[in-house]
Swiss-Prot record:
NCBIfam families: PRK05738.2-4. The gene is rplW. GO terms for molecular function: rRNA binding; structural constituent of ribosome. It comes from the Bacteria. InterPro entries: Nucleotide-bd_a/b_plait_sf, Ribosomal_uL23-like, Ribosomal_uL23/eL15/eS24_sf. GO terms for biological process: translation. It comes from Lachnoclostridium phytofermentans (strain ATCC 700394 / DSM 18823 / ISDg). This is Large ribosomal subunit protein uL23. Part of the 50S ribosomal subunit. Contacts protein L29, and trigger factor when it is bound to the ribosome. GO terms for cellular component: ribonucleoprotein complex; ribosome. Keywords: Ribonucleoprotein, Ribosomal protein, RNA-binding, rRNA-binding. Belongs to the universal ribosomal protein uL23 family. One of the early assembly proteins it binds 23S rRNA. One of the proteins that surrounds the polypeptide exit tunnel on the outside of the ribosome. Forms the main docking site for trigger factor binding to the ribosome. Pfam families: Ribosomal_L23. HAMAP family: Ribosomal_uL23_B.
Length: 99
């Protein structure tokens, strides 16, 4: 298990059409550190965004995509994605409002 601080766990929010539609169910998508656990993601969200209470966390490891540039082929880096479900009485996350 990685020794990560809560501000190192969440890298950036994922803003796609699918993630925006799931916000009505209080589900938010984040790109997280590859070694972060579900408990670390839960603690990071509750500490970084005041008034939020996490009900559940779903994580998935995404493989890198194959890319070519001329005759050279390679792969993009692997990433980890977390979908955080907030409780009904929880406050909304401010960075997603107004999008």
């Amino acid at each position: 298990m990685a020794n990560l601080k809560y501000y190192d766990v969440i890298l950036k929010p994922i803003v796609t059409e699918k993630s925006m539609n799931s916000m009505s169910e209080k589900k938010y998508s984040f790109s997280v550190h590859p070694e972060a656990t579900k408990t670390q993601v839960k603690e990071a969200v509750e500490k970084m965004f005041a008034g939020t209470k996490v009900a559940s966390v779903n994580t998935m490891n995404l493989e890198g995509k194959n890319r070519r540039r001329g005759n050279t082929s390679g792969k993009t880096s692997k990433t980890k994605k977390a979908i955080v479900q907030l409780t009904a009485d929880s406050a909304e996350i401010e960075i997603f409002t107004g999008l």
